[in-house]
Amino acid sequence: MNSASTHKNTDFWIFGLFFFLYFFIMATCFPFLPVWLSDVVGLSKTDTGIVFSCLSLFAISFQPLLGVISDRLGLKKNLIWSISLLLVFFAPFFLYVFAPLLHLNIWAGALTGGVFIGFVFSAGAGAIEAYIERVSRSSGFEYGKARMFGCLGWALCATMAGILFNVDPSLVFWMGSGGALLLLLLLYLARPSTSQTAMVMNALGANSSLISTRMVFSLFRMRQMWMFVLYTIGVACVYDVFDQQFAIFFRSFFDTPQAGIKAFGFATTAGEICNAIIMFCTPWIINRIGAKNTLLVAGGIMTIRITGSAFATTMTEVVILKMLHALEVPFLLVGAFKYITGVFDTRLSATVYLIGFQFSKQLAAILLSTFAGHLYDRMGFQNTYFVLGMIVLTVTVISAFTLSSSPGIVHPSVEKAPVAHSEIN
């Protein structure tokens, strides 16, 4: 598929805008969640770690299920409708259920918040990404360029949220619920089409959404699956844990918390704009260096950002390190999908992504989030960052020898149907 066909594709624009709105809504939650938990709710760093552990707990409860459901539904929008409808109640839940429960009992609040946030964001994001990636292969547009719109949505919201948070934090959540109403309208208008190439592949059975339980379980007998999980836990998961409370560390370099939050919002926006530009170019880069090398580059960038934060002493340094996030995200996300569709059976792409990537990250984060929270309280941010950075570096080096660089597809031996090779360009 080329750029011209992508830009003339109606599905590209509809699902690009869907990405924009969904990540706009998500940005009303995650970038400022640790600050909201600390300043508004009044939680300690350890209690904040408990909340994030519960988010991970319920994310891993939902992700395998959503992965299998997504592969079975194919291009049907049932699951996406469920996630979008729940997002309408985002603000009422945070303000009238989540916060009061956290004041009443940390575990009651953390578990309740984990159910909601774990479904609509932690697991829901993976389901939506896997669905749109499937649509991109069926309709004939480039997934990486559609995903770029998500970066722009996050960027716009980060600036608005950074300003509104200092006025009234509740306004940020209501902005998210308002965006969900537009998301429902866009989803109603979405009518995924099928390109001529995809129709031929469907006729051959290459893109069949009919999968069996045996096919799913056979994934866990594959060395390639476990090596991908190792990379995900040791690199992507550790990086996510590092980034969870980075906003608190970031604002410590400013004279007032308000100035730090505002600067964090602007830095996030600038980073996401750069993220979008790089995301647009990522398919071109990945096609030249390969999916494995793309994941290794992402690991190197994450190592630099985490370890660099351990030695940062000025506001300028911490802003530059924050901007490195713009380089890491495109290489990790698009590289992961490229690796999955290049190594595994494309009929199981959503299952591999939600179990091998999202599920494994969240499962490990249950322990790592609480562990990191204790380290923050005992050792401080920078000593903890050094430990996390060394873990990421070590696993990245190991992955250079364990990830597969073969262009051939590995698919369950229990299924003999022909499988075509589909790539994200």
Curated annotation (Swiss-Prot):
The gene is rafB. This is Raffinose permease. Keywords: Cell inner membrane, Cell membrane, Membrane, Plasmid, Sugar transport, Symport, Transmembrane, Transmembrane helix, Transport. GO terms for molecular function: lactose binding; lactose:proton symporter activity. The chain crosses the membrane at residues 12-32, 49-69, 79-99, 106-126, 148-168, 170-190, 230-250, 266-286, 295-315, 317-337, 352-372, 384-404. It is a multi-pass membrane protein. The record marks E129, R147 as: Substrate binding. InterPro entries: LacY/RafB_perm_fam, LacY/RafB_perm_fam_CS, MFS_dom, MFS_trans_sf. The lineage of its organism: Bacteria, Pseudomonadati, Pseudomonadota, Gammaproteobacteria, Enterobacterales. Monomer. Responsible for transport of raffinose into the cell. Can also transport lactose and melibiose. Has weak activity with maltose. GO terms for cellular component: plasma membrane. Residues 33-48, 100-105, 169, 251-265, 316, 373-383 are periplasmic. The record marks R305, H325, E328 as: Proton translocation.
